[in-house]
């Protein structure tokens, strides 16, 4: 957590980050952390809200829970990649079940990377600092 406190928000461009997670405690923790890093955050707790908010907010990065109650994260990732203003959005899958099949399906659906919950704050900070490449 110390690395987060050393980050100067003005040192890097602010990103728009959408958190898609049905666990409100996890959403709150990630949102606070990402705001401390100097980024703008919105969140959705289900797939329908995720699509709606993504269309309006146009995030540069989406942290997407694979196991949502209404849609699988794979389906959301595929849908987002077809959206005209979102096809270049970086989608990072997060899952409580980091099995190889989950990873494979997430990558096939358009996710850039897959991480187990909870995400390490230093890894999250590095991901948000990185440009898509």
PLM region descriptions:
Residues 1-18, 122-133:
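Non-catalytic signal-transmission and effector/linker regions of two-component phosphorelay proteins
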Residues 57-63, 68:
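Active-site beta3 strand of CheY-like receiver
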